[in-house]
Amino acid sequence: MAAALLARASGPVRRALRPRAWRQLHTIYQSVELPETHQMLLQTCRDFAEKELFPIAAQVDKEHLFPAAQVKKMGGLGLLAMDVPEELGGAGLDYLAYAIAMEEISRGCASTGVIMSVNNSLYLGPILKFGSKEQKQKWVTPFTSGDKIGCFALSEPGNGSDAGAASTTARAEGDSWVLNGTKAWITNAWEASAAVVFASTDRALQNKGISAFLVPMPTPGLTLGKKEDKLGIRGSSTANLIFEDCRIPKDSILGEPGMGFKIAMQTLDMGRIGIASQALGIAQTALDCAVNYAENRMAFGAPLTKLQVIQFKLADMALALESARLLTWRAAMLKDNKKPFIKEAAMAKLAASEAATAISHQAIQILGGMGYVTEMPAERHYRDARITEIYEGTSEIQRLVIAGHLLRSYRS
């Protein structure tokens, strides 16, 4: 898969690299520049987004259209399984590479970005970390090429941020587990071929009684709720998963019984880097839109960019974007180097999501009336940005995570 990405590059960067360089990756960078491998990846993903995603983004949003052909092409490039080892069909890259690719794909189409994020971080991530060899062969390899994608079922109608309060149950019965309950707000639900599902196997133990399961889709006893009509990221389906005596094999449990809450929290820690990167892509394309418009819109005999008030807005937008990008890349590098990254991932997700909302808001202000109509993409960027402050941990949850780690460091 890494070779597929390599083949898309051209010029001196490609000639200077060999496939082996993809496996060397990075340690801690002493330079402000990205390694050549990552620069090449960035350009490859940018070219793909400009050719394949920018032209369809408005249609995807308007028609709630799942971009199946583009997702398939992304699978062929390794973008749906970026840190999955090559022997399992993945690209075998690192999390910094994933963050870079996620930003560029999301810059082209935010809906496609979240489809990519869920498959990489939330579906494949926990199986890679906690799955057995047999589970990886069954539940990872078929989900790397774009033929199949997965989803992650944690939230419920009665709990979102309170992830430990699962009311969905799984009881052991012979050689099976039987699931009952409803999971809510499941991204990719209507297109997914499998789900990582969290259910209580012992309610008396509260969050220590939650377990994780691998569930094929479709399967008897599992039905899908209606597709939610959302404000943004409308090309990615969101729906409930409804379990009614849904029977799955005993070996479908991921990890050990009672490990589900741990698996969920560690998965979300990784996923926040992906969502931060999605937010960066939305913020970048909103800034691009604002600058392009302001350079060409004449007012008082000159382009808008000659006005100090517009320059100040653009400067603030760029500052927020670049600051969030550095936080995101740092979190990814810490993870790649097996250093603690939970606080940094929360900071990245918080900074990037709030930057995306603020930047897309200011982009509309710069465009004025043109920012409020669908003729321009600014209003779509604003709608797409808003969810990044909500899913995979709200901004309030990120602040709790950051404060908790900060205070523990002072008290230790």
Swiss-Prot record:
Positions contributing to FAD binding: 152-161, 185-187, 297, 308, 365-369, 394-396
N6-acetyllysine modifications at: 51, 72, 129, 208, 262, 306
Domain of life, per lineage: Eukaryota
Phosphothreonine PTM sites in chain numbering: 27
Residues forming the catalytic site: 392
Protein name, entry field: Short-chain specific acyl-CoA dehydrogenase, mitochondrial
Cellular component terms per the entry's GO annotation: mitochondrial matrix
Compartments reported by the entry: Mitochondrion matrix
Entry function: Short-chain specific acyl-CoA dehydrogenase is one of the acyl-CoA dehydrogenases that catalyze the first step of mitochondrial fatty acid beta-oxidation, an aerobic process breaking down fatty acids into acetyl-CoA and allowing the production of energy from fats.
Cofactor note: Binds 1 FAD per subunit.
Catalytic reactions on record: a short-chain 2,3-saturated fatty acyl-CoA + oxidized [electron-transfer flavoprotein] + H(+) = a short-chain (2E)-enoyl-CoA + reduced [electron-transfer flavoprotein]; butanoyl-CoA + oxidized [electron-transfer flavoprotein] + H(+) = (2E)-butenoyl-CoA + reduced [electron-transfer flavoprotein]; pentanoyl-CoA + oxidized [electron-transfer flavoprotein] + H(+) = (2E)-pentenoyl-CoA + reduced [electron-transfer flavoprotein]; hexanoyl-CoA + oxidized [electron-transfer flavoprotein] + H(+) = (2E)-hexenoyl-CoA + reduced [electron-transfer flavoprotein]
Organism of derivation: Pongo abelii
Family label: Belongs to the acyl-CoA dehydrogenase family.
Binding site for substrate: 161, 269-272, 393
Sites bearing N6-succinyllysine, chain numbering: 51, 129, 262, 306
GO molecular function annotations of the record: acyl-CoA dehydrogenase activity; flavin adenine dinucleotide binding; short-chain fatty acyl-CoA dehydrogenase activity
Transit peptide stretch: 1-24
Complex formation: Homotetramer.
Cofactors demanded by this protein: FAD
A Pfam family that the UniProt record links to this protein: Acyl-CoA_dh_M
SUPFAM superfamilies: Acyl-CoA dehydrogenase C-terminal domain-like (SSF47203), Acyl-CoA dehydrogenase NM domain-like (SSF56645)
